[in-house]
Amino acid sequence: MNVIPCSIKTLKGLYDISGVEVGQHLYWQIGALQIHAQVLITSWVVIAILLGSVIIAVRNPQTIPSGGQNFFEYVLEFIRDLSKAQIGEEYGPWVPFIGTMFLFIFVSNWSGALLPWKIIQLPHGELAAPTNDINTTVALALPTSVAYFYAGLTKKGLGYFRKYIQPTPILLPINILEDFTKPLSLSFRLFGNILADELVVVVLVSLVPSLVPIPVMFLGLFTSGIQALIFATLAAAYIGESMEGHH
């Protein structure tokens, strides 16, 4: 007797899922420019969280750190170790870049799971983690490519381009293609993982709106942190590779 009500409930859940549209966006028209408002809003929130946390934690620095200052010093030490492991002894100038990438992506990813973006109603689309949008991930990957070339040219000058014909000139097209695929792989990997994680949670909440999605949400938090670490590690590895000249 309970089969029909359960079936109706399941169909209703599937109908709700069909209403989830990934491609809807809210745009701001500024002159001739069309600005993707959702990404800007959520990115500003993430930046405000990062800046606010740092200002509060280190507004009264102590010789013996404690509390928030101790936490951020631990984070800085972690980023230094990561940069040194991938880049080598010349890692110092790249710590701010790698740290900025890691912290922004980490907080952006976690904001998708922890902040109630859905409460804010928009005329079109809905708010989500900044890294849930391909525009953000590409915008993060492109500076990594610029840093990659800058590091190589700064270290080796025009001799940097010799790597494209090593070990044989026949590999020139493949070596050039490799440099173009690096930012693509960084951006699509991050975008795909964060989007998939949020969609899985939406589907489970629509079908089983109880405690079942909670383990998936915790798994999403873990995956989000790993994705930030992977992005920062690969960015540092690419920079180190361009400076050392080995593959």
From Swiss-Prot:
Where found?
A: Plastid, Chloroplast thylakoid membrane
GO cellular component, alphabetical, reads: chloroplast thylakoid membrane; plasma membrane; proton-transporting ATP synthase complex
Q: Which UniProt keywords apply?
A: ATP synthesis, CF(0), Chloroplast, Hydrogen ion transport, Ion transport, Membrane, Plastid, Thylakoid, Transmembrane, Transmembrane helix, Transport
Annotated membrane-spanning segments are 38-58, 95-115, 134-154, 199-219, 220-240
Provide any one GO MF term from the record.
Answer: proton-transporting ATP synthase activity, rotational mechanism
Q: How does the protein's chain sit in the membrane according to the entry?
A: Multi-pass membrane protein
Question: What broad class describes the main subcellular location of this protein?
Answer: plastid
As for family, the record states: Belongs to the ATPase A chain family.
Record text on subunit structure and interactions? F-type ATPases have 2 components, CF(1) - the catalytic core - and CF(0) - the membrane proton channel. CF(1) has five subunits: alpha(3), beta(3), gamma(1), delta(1), epsilon(1). CF(0) has four main subunits: a, b, b' and c.
Role this protein plays: Key component of the proton channel; it plays a direct role in the translocation of protons across the membrane.
HAMAP family per record: ATP_synth_a_bact (MF_01393)
Provide the protein name: ATP synthase subunit a, chloroplastic
